[in-house]
Swiss-Prot record:
TM segment ranges: none
Primary location: cytoplasm
Source organism of the structure: Halothermothrix orenii (strain H 168 / OCM 544 / DSM 9562)
Originating gene: dapF
Annotated pathway: Amino-acid biosynthesis; L-lysine biosynthesis via DAP pathway; DL-2,6-diaminopimelate from LL-2,6-diaminopimelate: step 1/1
Name of this chain's protein: Diaminopimelate epimerase
Amino acid sequence: MELSFTKMHGTGNDFIMVNGSNYPDLDFSKLARQLCRRHFSIGADGLIIVLPPESVEHDFRMRIFNADGSEAEMCGNGIRCFAHYLRENNLTTRDVLKIETLAGIITPEIVSYNGDKSLIKVNMGRPHFKSEEIPVNIEDELDYVKNFPLKIGNKKLNINCVSMGNPHTIIFVEDVNQIPVSTWGQEIEHNPLFPQKTNVEFIQIQSEDEIIMRVWERGSGITLACGTGACASVVAGIKNGLLKNMVTVHLPGGDLNIEWQEQDVFMTGPAESVYTGKIVIQEG
């Protein structure tokens, strides 16, 4: 079977985009495992499926699968690529969209569109802090998991937990370049403290409006960027009195601008097409 796709990225967080309406019988989890393998297939951090909405009040529905085949609730860089895909493929002429995700309705706005690249601002919704909402397995439920001690090997870390529709664990460090992101990230992701696993962000504070971030994504490993992670990290920094309300997040794949005024979080960043193609996949 021949499958059409588009390869896109948002600040280096790369995705394979597929119009799911054309392939209603595909196992998308299996497809993600097949296509996201770097060096052996197309290679990507995740697979994004474009679908019609379940409600007439919304525009489209997004499903996103990590490289390991697990389905994610939401992805900040992915939702920007999703909006860019819709415009590039003439599936919409609207600038503001209502997209159904497992994390709820997300509203991206196409600020500018220039052929293969867009600048997109996304209302990411409100962050959640209660331990049961993230979720975090803590005996005494907390309104905010702030600087909670977690031992990794011989190292004791202070973690902060925020949900942006998906779970994030934020750790403030002096120098992100000195952190074994792969080792610590994998251990924290699979720690029994997190029944649904967790994304892990390591944050170096540059100033009140600037941070450096490294990320270990649940189900994908080290990536060049994570939009929901950038949002969660800025929110955690503000909650800890370390950051102002508008922050630039420096990631290996580029910069994201995050704003939080105690209600909804807004993220602004690019989305870019890399190429389109077709690949033969085995059914069944």
